[in-house]
Swiss-Prot record:
InterPro entries: Flag_Lring. The basal body constitutes a major portion of the flagellar organelle and consists of four rings (L,P,S, and M) mounted on a central rod. The keyword Membrane applies. Belongs to the FlgH family. Assembles around the rod to form the L-ring and probably protects the motor/basal body from shearing forces during rotation. PANTHER family: FLAGELLAR L-RING PROTEIN. One of its GO terms (biological process) is bacterial-type flagellum-dependent cell motility. It comes from Legionella pneumophila subsp. pneumophila (strain Philadelphia 1 / ATCC 33152 / DSM 7513). It is found in: Cell outer membrane; Bacterial flagellum basal body. GO terms for molecular function: cytoskeletal motor activity. This is Flagellar L-ring protein. A lipid is attached at C19 (S-diacylglycerol cysteine). Coiled coil: none annotated.
Amino acid sequence: MNRLNIAVSCLATALLFGCEALHPPAPGDNPDYAPTYPVTPDPKELRKVSGAIYSSETALPLFETPRARHPGDILTVYLIEKTDAQKNATTTQRKNDTTKITNKLFLGRPISLGSGYSMDFDLDNQRQFNGEGRSIQNNKLAGSISVTVAKVLANGNMVVQGEKWVRINQGNEFVRLSGIVRPQDIKADNTITSDRIANARISYGGTGQINNTNAQGWLSRILWGPLFPT
């Protein structure tokens, strides 16, 4: 009975590892990429009469470019990510040991084990190991995404974040981005390239049937899980 319980427990654990799947991402499920909206002024504050015509809450800039600078402002990011990585490794180890003993003498006299026997022997040991590895990886991501300013730091830099979802046929494609932007790097048309964003976090993926075809099945996940280490 104990063996049966152990077998059932092991099978249940294996099924859990095999059936384990990450919840597919969905729009708005991650607050790190949620949009930030401008702060709406209190109507009571707007109704206060100070005697001046100018009001900072309703002011519109007339002589400055429409660049993002306040929380809730929109900034367009052009994605120009490209990485090329290549690594080669070659290892060779070789060792040869040879030992030969002849003319055995003890106290100046030859040693004999009798007729038909000899104490002469040769020992030859050879070991060799050859290893070679090569890895090549190329990645490229191009496109654009509009994000919002989430926070303005003390030095004037801005934390931006956002996501874009596009439904194509039976699946969804998404791009998520967050990072820190310098106001000086924003162009006059309120755009910036992704290579100018510090601490950038860029994610591209998809959901749906087409994306699921690239994932392993439950049996493959069991065989490649921690219960069957390679």
